[in-house]
């Protein structure tokens, strides 16, 4: 019960932080920050960091780390651009080939970590350097452009207004039905359930946020496709982490690897799958990045791994392993993107942007360690 209350408190703190950040930048930019156009851009920024953070949180929960995701995202995005611009591959072939490469590179990292017992810090640091080198070699150090119109839709396309409203309605109905299903399941198991008024408040708040966001986005061009991709990945990640044996194994390994082995969990196989899955998510983020930029760049993805790790830590994941949630890291990614977007609108110097994000990351880790000492 204490753990549940701590998690809920953490979520509330993150939501309050987002509200404060948005209120501050809205005042500082005379309302431009909360314009439909900027919110659309902000959510598209979040989709890339969010996709990386969803993969990263599984790695961190298992008490590992991946420093290569930024370079790998740049490499896979660059490969997608080359396949589209230089080789003229059809879009489905480009997508499949890019995701397959992400899977292969993820398995490569996972094999060294799980079966060769090389620390993930070293393996992925090597990948951080090697993947960037491969990208520069493939592109000859030049920008690959222009990407075809069919591919740019991935990063720059929008859902129609009507389709967005219908999708939002389905999301709200699905959320309510899922909440009722969980409530009945707990009642059948004679477990404690929250008051109906509290559930209704939660449903109403969810509906206001989702439908309000859709209304705002429709005031510009509609829901961006990258946001839909992030939503699907988040739902799949939530299901995988909460409702499958794989998810329970990941938490068990991060919490106590020796106990996990004694309970019969195949630690090596699980870690290999974690890194393979991370590679696939990096590939998806790379596709969105290149499609959004309309080009593949040898510098693409620089420092993206730091944003992903920061999103995880801000979202409640512990670098010691065993703790973290997909929902939390998506909120963390939104916080990171909100700061980047707001400071860019205010023309804050780059060095100050790094200092601010570094300070927030340090504060998040300090809060996490302080909470652990109290427990």
Swiss-Prot record:
UniProt subcellular location: Cell inner membrane
Name recorded for this polypeptide: Xylose transport system permease protein XylH
Superkingdom of origin: Bacteria
Molecular functions per Gene Ontology: transmembrane transporter activity
Keywords attached to this entry: Cell inner membrane, Cell membrane, Membrane, Sugar transport, Transmembrane, Transmembrane helix, Transport
Organism, as annotated: Haemophilus influenzae (strain ATCC 51907 / DSM 11121 / KW20 / Rd)
PANTHER family: ABC TRANSPORTER PERMEASE PROTEIN YPHD-RELATED-RELATED (PTHR32196), XYLOSE TRANSPORT SYSTEM PERMEASE PROTEIN XYLH (PTHR32196:SF32)
Coiled coil spans: none
GO cellular component, one term: plasma membrane
Function as written in the Swiss-Prot or TrEMBL entry: Part of the binding-protein-dependent transport system for D-xylose. Probably responsible for the translocation of the substrate across the membrane.
Transmembrane segments: 9-29, 52-72, 85-105, 118-138, 159-179, 199-219, 220-240, 271-291, 319-339, 348-368
Topology in the lipid bilayer: Multi-pass membrane protein
Keyword Transmembrane helix: yes
UniProt keyword annotation of Membrane present: yes
Similarity annotation: Belongs to the binding-protein-dependent transport system permease family. AraH/RbsC subfamily.
InterPro entries: ABC_transp_permease (IPR001851)
